Structure formats: structure tokens, C-alpha cells
Amino acid sequence: MSMYTTAQLLAANEQKFKFDPLFLRLFFRESYPFTTEKVYLSQIPGLVNMALYVSPIVSGEVIRSRGGSTSEFTPGYVKPKHEVNPQMTLRRLPDEDPQNLADPAYRRRRIIMQNMRDEELAIAQVEEMQAVSAVLKGKYTMTGEAFDPVEVDMGRSAANNITQSGSTEWSKRDKSTYDPTDDIEAYALNASGVVNIIVFDPKGWALFRSFKAVREKLDTRRGSHSELETAVKDLGKAVSYKGMYGDVAIVVYSGQYVENGVKKNFLPDNTMVLGNTQARGLRTYGCIQDADAQRESINASARYPKNWVTTGDPAREFTMIQSAPLMLLADPDEFVSVQLA
């Protein structure tokens, strides 16, 4: 008889964290893989005049004098890699029933697939971080293996990055009498287009909702804005749709990434982002720089997964996924980022 029930075995799952690529799915829907190491912005439809401001980073400092505007760019290259250690196939996997042990061949397949999932997750976190930073700041620092850090600046207007201070701080307002609607409408005027969605982090949402006027105006009913609801529904455990505030959807994002074994939130505390679900975010990718990929005629691709064995005494087996991601906004001023206080 088994030592564990089915429920106990199902519970023996890998540790979860709240990773949910909301910004990628909501704002970055176009994908452009290139057959060249560089990404050419002029080859993306509608971006003929777009250029990035590129600045090397030396010892943590952005060197503006060495930067410049460019319409072609070399993305950072990422390639998370794992070894499939033969010793791992001899040990019981965490979810194996001790009374019904699997054979090493099965464990090897399981380990390979788990490695691939971990590698895909590692790359997806890089992409989401680029997407979030592009929306929040209009720029981000790009890093990769054997790649000097570079700041990618999309040219966000300074007026679109707002920090509340002094008399504008919501935390100092009377929660029973003050109405933050006028503030939001004023912030929205800085956007280059119409604002139809606001994304909060949990603390920012708590501050916003603390106003009596907000609780009275927030419409939590469904059905009146079908297009918006379609865009924001079923977005996962790390995303919560709170309702409509006038003609604007309110969403709370608690997505996380892991850095050096520590879980961190993608959105800083007390963040509010105003945007539009039709904003044109671009997932661009440089070519895969791998001889095996070239032999398989796989050059323009967002991913290149591989599993191989090196001969020797002993032979060793590895898994790896390669990618050269560069998340861009066609118009960084479609978003307004507000640091609440």
C-alpha cells in the first residue's frame, strides 16, 4: 500500500511564486524575430522614424557622452543552462511515491523537462522585467552573458514620470472628503493617447481605495465594457481586476520575479500606471547565435531550446534555452507612471 494519498502526492509540487507576465500579455502583443544579430527598427512596420538612445554603463554609471541615437541595436543574449546529472536519476523525485518508484530513464525525461521549464521561466522573467521597466520609466538597463550593460532609452517625456510630493501626496489627503479623480485626469493629459486602464501595485491600490469617493465611484459590475473586460479577464493569480472607474479599468498587479533566490515584486510599492490596452509594445529578438541552430535553419526565433551530450570520460548531458530579447515601446508616452506618496 502507498505511504501517501493522491492528494499528498499532488501537494508535493515545486515551490510557486507569483510570476505572471501581465505587461507582456497586455501591452506587448507584437513579435519581431530577426535573422541578424542586430534588431533594425526601420524594418518594423510603422517605426521608420523611431530610434533608441543607447548608453554604455561602466562601473554602474551611465556614460551619456559615449551613447547616441540608433535605429539598429544589438540585444543582450541570455542562455540559462542546466546539467542533467546521472546521479539525479538515481534518487527519488520529490513527487514520487516511495512504494511505486520510477525508473532512471523516466526520471531523466522528467529532469530534462523541468530544466526546460526553469530556463523558459528565467527568460520570461527577463522579458517581463524589460516590459515593466519600459512602461514605468521608458528605459531599462540591458545585460547578458559576455555583454557589457547598456541602457536602452526610448525617449519618454519627463512629464510622463510623476512623483507625488508635498501637497500632492495622497497619503496626506482627507480620505473622507478628497476626490483623487481630478488628479488622475490631470495625469492622463500627459499621455499621448486615451487612457483606458490603470495598473496599481497592491499598496498603491490600497491607498487609492482608501478614499471614500473612489469606493463610491468604482463600478464592480461586469458587462458594460466588453472589450476592456476581455483584455483584462483571466490574467492569472498575480492579477486582480477591480472594476471600472468611469471608463477606465482598474487592475492590481502583484507579479514577482526571483533574483539571487529572493522573491521581488515587478512593480515598486505605491505605483500607479496609466495606459491603454491598445498601446503598441514590441517584442523584438536578435538572431540565435548557435551553430546547431544554423544547421537546423533556425535563425529568426524568440527561443532556441537544446539538449545535448558531450562525449568523454564521463559523458555529460546539458539543457539550455537561448534568446536575445529586446522589449520596446513604439510610443513610450502612451503611458504615464506615477509614484504615489
Language model regions located:
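Long, contiguous amphipathic alpha-helices that act as assembly "spine/axial" helices in icosahedral shell
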Residues: P80-S157, P180-D183, Y187-G204, A315-Q322
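N-terminal alpha-helical "arm" segments
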Residues: M1-L41, L329-A341
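Assembly/oligomerization interface modules of large self-assembling protein complexes
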Residues: E30-P98
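Hydrophobic alpha-helical segments and helix pairs
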Residues: M3-D20, F147-T177
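Sequence/fold signature of self-assembling virion shell proteins
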Residues: R215-A341
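Acidic/histidine-enriched, beta-strand-rich ligand/metal-binding domains
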Residues: W170-I198, K203-F211, R215-D219, H225-T230, ...
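Short alpha-helical segments and helix-capping/turn motifs at coil-helix boundaries
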Residues: R25, D182-E185, P305
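Short, Φ-rich (hydrophobic/aromatic) sequence segments
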Residues: N13-E14, D182-Y187, M327
